[in-house]
């Protein structure tokens, strides 16, 4: 890996010396609503504002050099292009999404680095992850599947914080992240991206149009990620970062049809071999109690598509199927799990005057089986979970006048155990003029919990899992208020986007880490839980070579039970993002990006020597990029510039099987092995270098 890093470095120097820089070009777009002409030096911003206005999907006045847009809908939804995430290039979607204010990828284990995505402080189980609008990533697949979504297959990501459309159902309590994959018709004929770093990791992306004619196009892409370097900077005899060897193959077909009817389908296969644990662990130690290691093999297959029926009315069929198998050991604890999900949805859409009507029917069938008590009946016999959910929805987006738009939605789902589930949605957009937009949305949520797929702590064996009672479904009331202001300054403007959010939970299922140090006790909360807060984003939109984007979020997430208020774990009250970009005249650009977090409550044991709250910290990155006119692009930089590393993420790493817990002399406080304290990556300052190349 070091040799590859040196070769890439020399290659970039040679190309820089031989290829002449290109004069800066610009892309001029007219915004009629503001009567402003603006120029962008970003080559990636190829879609004209006129085209976007015709589609009526994008609020064009929010376009800037960060390639961030807002959907022109009563529901506040931000759209982030691939160019936005290239400001800090990463290997997968899980790491990339940290650049979005109010969205936090949370590492839940200091050993294997499983994680979930928090929106506005709510745990990852409350975030609905969609691919091309379909719930392909759920339950078991969220444990390690998020790191298996390579950025190379992503065209853009749509983020909705708070109540989303009734189309998405009742489980999207915290918000929705919709990953839109690349369109084979519009993709380059060939593209590749190779990135490596000084710690030995390598990420390879290759994409090629294998078919391209007047009727259809097919895009075949390969992503390979490898990290095999055992690093232990904090000297606790555990790997700081898990070793990973994964591959993802993606194939998408897009068809050209009469009257621009939609038709596409895609397939993806994903495999990963992941290990984290003691430095001396080897494959022969897998599943034994000789040396502690967490070894996970993941196999996953996805098939999904869209087909618009050849009818006068607009009927759109969405379909997907995914198979996910996990073969894992956490120390000597085996976890074997299989999940199969079938999803079908027929959508109807029609414009009647000022009303955009939508309706549809849905079937989501989930099969889940594992070797834990979660799929055992009262007699202790294996009983896989089979949960078909049938539903339908109605939605009316009513443009009352030029200033007011009202969205009314309702969804009904039938669950075989919990029966009828009703999910109303209301959203209102008020735009008195092009400079001010107010959005208000409200909805309810309903969610059934699977502890063994949603909470990694239930699997590690570091604590005994206790389920206190029959768990009831969680219910919530959610509301979101958004205000977008565009401040004109001569021929430019500044965007200010402020969002307030509030969620109230009944029957919230919580894990009690505090009552007994060797147990996690799960039960429905007798009281209630609340997530509330406010966030603000400020970004520039001008022709100057410097661009700024800054976001900050304040939130208060807690549960209240019998008069006691307990702050939620891993939910900092203050957090934010920053992005400073500068475009030089000779096709050089630099990006300073990062996130900052305030103190967050952490799972500690009684008399724990570690602080109950994390310190303030920031993860800062810097990148330098050089573009050439022949399709080459070279980039490199430094991650975690301030070298922040959490202290003591693992408790008693020298006794991972708790063989000496009862030794009062060496363990007077009764500490047990625990991996849940980690709150940030263990990788310190490090460098990266990459090369991109594409042929249109």
Regions found by a protein language model. Give the residues of each.
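N-terminal periplasmic accessory domains that precede
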Residues: 60, 93-96, 115-118, 130, ...
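Short acidic/polar hinge/loop motifs at secondary-structure boundaries
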Residues: 118, 134-161, 249, 468
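Membrane-embedded beta-barrel scaffold of Gram-negative outer-membrane proteins
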Residues: 314-328, 431, 439, 472-524, ...
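Gram-negative outer-membrane beta-barrel transporters
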Residues: 399-403, 501-504, 524-604, 692
């Amino acid at each position: 890996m070091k040799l590859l890093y040196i070769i890439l470095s020399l290659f970039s120097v040679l190309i820089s010396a031989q290829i002449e820089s290109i004069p800066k070009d610009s892309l001029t777009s007219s915004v009629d609503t503001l009567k402003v002409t603006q120029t962008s030096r970003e080559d990636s911003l190829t879609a004209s504002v006129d085209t976007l206005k015709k589609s009526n999907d994008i609020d064009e006045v929010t376009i800037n050099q960060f390639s961030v847009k807002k959907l022109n809908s009563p529901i506040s939804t931000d759209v982030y292009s691939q160019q936005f995430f290239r400001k800090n290039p990463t290997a997968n979607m899980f790491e990339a999404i940290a650049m979005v204010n109010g969205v936090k990828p949370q590492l839940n284990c200091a050993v294997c680095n499983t994680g979930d995505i928090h929106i506005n402080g709510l745990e990852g189980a409350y975030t609905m992850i969609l691919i091309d609008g379909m719930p392909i990533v759920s339950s078991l697949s969220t444990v390690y599947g998020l790191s298996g979504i390579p950025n190379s297959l992503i065209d853009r990501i749509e983020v909705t914080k708070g109540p989303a459309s009734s189309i998405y159902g009742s489980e999207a309590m915290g918000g929705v992240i919709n990953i839109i994959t690349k369109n084979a018709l519009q993709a380059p004929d060939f593209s590749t991206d190779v990135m490596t770093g000084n710690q030995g990791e390598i990420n390879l992306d290759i994409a090629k149009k294998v078919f391209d004619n007047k009727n259809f196009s097919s895009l075949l892409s390969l992503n390979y990620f490898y990290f095999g370097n055992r690093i232990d900077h904090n000297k606790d005899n555990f790997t700081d970062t898990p070793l990973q060897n994964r591959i993802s193959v993606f194939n998408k077909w897009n068809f050209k049809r009469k009257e621009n009817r939609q038709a596409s389908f895609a397939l993806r296969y994903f495999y990963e071999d992941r290990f984290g644990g003691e430095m001396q662990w080897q494959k022969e130690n897998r599943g034994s109690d000789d040396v502690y290691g967490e070894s996970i093999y993941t196999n996953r297959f996805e098939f999904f598509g869209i087909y618009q029926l050849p009818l006068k009315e607009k009927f759109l069929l969405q379909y997907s199927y995914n198979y996910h198998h996990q073969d894992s050991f956490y120390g000597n604890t085996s976890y074997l799990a299989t999940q199969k999900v079938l999803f079908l949805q027929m959508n109807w859409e029609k414009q009647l005057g000022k009303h955009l009507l939508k309706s549809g029917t849905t079937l989501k069938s989930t099969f889940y089986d594992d070797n834990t008590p979660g799929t055992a009946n009262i007699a202790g016999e294996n009983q896989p979970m089979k949960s078909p959910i049938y539903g339908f929805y109605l939605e009316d987006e009513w443009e009352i006048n030029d200033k007011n738009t009202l969205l009314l939605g309702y969804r009904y789902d039938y669950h075989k155990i919990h029966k009828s589930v009703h999910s109303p949605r209301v959203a209102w957009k008020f735009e008195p003029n092009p400079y001010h937009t107010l959005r208000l949305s409200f909805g309810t949520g309903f969610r059934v919990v699977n502890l063994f797929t949603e909470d990694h702590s239930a699997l590690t064996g570091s604590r005994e899992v206790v389920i206190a009672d029959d768990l009831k479904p969680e219910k919530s009331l959610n509301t979101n208020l958004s205000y977008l202001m565009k401040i004109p300054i001569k021929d430019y403007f500044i965007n200010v986007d402020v969002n307030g959010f509030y969620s109230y939970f009944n029957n919230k299922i919580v894990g009690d880490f505090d009552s007994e140090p060797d147990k996690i006790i799960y039960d429905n909360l007798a009281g209630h839980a609340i997530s509330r807060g406010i966030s603000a984003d400020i970004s520039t939109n001008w022709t100057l070579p410097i661009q700024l984007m800054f976001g900050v979020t304040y939130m208060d997430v807690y549960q209240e039970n019998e008069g006691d208020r307990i702050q939620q774990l891993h939910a900092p009250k203050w957090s934010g993002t920053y992005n400073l970009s500068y475009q030089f005249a000779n096709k050089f650009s630099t990006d300073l990006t990062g996130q900052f977090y305030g103190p967050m409550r952490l799972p500690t044991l009684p008399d724990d020597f570690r602080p109950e709250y994390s310190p303030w910290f920031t993860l800062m990155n810097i990148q330098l990029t050089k573009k050439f006119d022949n399709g080459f692009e070279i980039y490199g930089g430094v991650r975690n510039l301030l070298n922040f590393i959490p202290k003591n993420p693992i408790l008693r790493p020298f006794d991972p099987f708790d063989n000496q817990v009862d030794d009062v002399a060496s363990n007077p406080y009764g500490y047990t092995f625990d991996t849940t304290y980690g709150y940030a990556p263990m990788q310190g300052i490090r460098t990266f270098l990459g090369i991109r190349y594409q042929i249109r």
